[in-house]
Amino acid sequence: MHALQAKILDPRLGQEFPLPQYATPGSAGLDLRAMLKEDIVLEPGQTVLIPTGLSIYIGDPGLAAMILPRSGLGHKHGIVLGNLVGLIDSDYQGELMVSCWNRGHTPFTIAIGERIAQLVLVPVVQAHFELVEQFDETQRGAGGFGHSGSH
């Protein structure tokens, strides 16, 4: 298992609320919590930036982290990430923040300490551009947006 440096920025994290952890041995994501001063009501269409009380330092340029929505919040309540996916670079050291967007039709209360997103480590391959005049020909070519067939 990879070690991930973390700093607790909100003293309630690890005391009143558990530190992020994997729920099962097969879990891919660590749950991030809303470390708010008070519960907030997210109105339909509203987006709010929510602190997690945690900063991380990945340090390995071969890794990055992604902040992803929790499936239950999106499916049951219409609460998704305002930026859809948060990408955390390996050299970032600031607080993890979660942009929550209520795409539903009813107000939703986010409680202090509620699990609002998940953090997943992913491998990164950095590439450089090799400028060419033409690409090698392929069957697909430049076709996109449904070009490979329907269902």
From Swiss-Prot:
<keyword id="KW-0460">Magnesium</keyword>
<comment type="pathway">
    <text>Pyrimidine metabolism; dUMP biosynthesis; dUMP from dCTP (dUTP route): step 2/2.</text>
</comment>
<feature type="binding site">
    <location>
        <begin position="70"/>
        <end position="72"/>
    </location>
    <ligand>
        <name>substrate</name>
    </ligand>
</feature>
<feature type="binding site">
    <location>
        <begin position="87"/>
        <end position="89"/>
    </location>
    <ligand>
        <name>substrate</name>
    </ligand>
</feature>
<keyword id="KW-0378">Hydrolase</keyword>
<dbReference type="GO" id="GO:0000287">
    <property type="term" value="F:magnesium ion binding"/>
</dbReference>
<comment type="function">
    <text>This enzyme is involved in nucleotide metabolism: it produces dUMP, the immediate precursor of thymidine nucleotides and it decreases the intracellular concentration of dUTP so that uracil cannot be incorporated into DNA.</text>
</comment>
<feature type="binding site">
    <location>
        <position position="83"/>
    </location>
    <ligand>
        <name>substrate</name>
    </ligand>
</feature>
<comment type="similarity">
    <text>Belongs to the dUTPase family.</text>
</comment>
<feature type="binding site">
    <location>
        <position position="97"/>
    </location>
    <ligand>
        <name>substrate</name>
    </ligand>
</feature>
<protein>
    <recommendedName>
        <fullName>Deoxyuridine 5'-triphosphate nucleotidohydrolase</fullName>
        <ecNumber>3.6.1.23</ecNumber>
    </recommendedName>
</protein>
<dbReference type="GO" id="GO:0006226">
    <property type="term" value="P:dUMP biosynthetic process"/>
</dbReference>
<keyword id="KW-0546">Nucleotide metabolism</keyword>
<dbReference type="InterPro" id="IPR033704">
    <property type="entry name" value="dUTPase_trimeric"/>
</dbReference>
<dbReference type="InterPro" id="IPR008181">
    <property type="entry name" value="dUTPase"/>
</dbReference>
<dbReference type="GO" id="GO:0004170">
    <property type="term" value="F:dUTP diphosphatase activity"/>
</dbReference>
<dbReference type="Pfam" id="PF00692">
    <property type="entry name" value="dUTPase"/>
</dbReference>
<keyword id="KW-0479">Metal-binding</keyword>
<dbReference type="InterPro" id="IPR036157">
    <property type="entry name" value="dUTPase-like_sf"/>
</dbReference>
<dbReference type="GO" id="GO:0046081">
    <property type="term" value="P:dUTP catabolic process"/>
</dbReference>
<dbReference type="InterPro" id="IPR029054">
    <property type="entry name" value="dUTPase-like"/>
</dbReference>
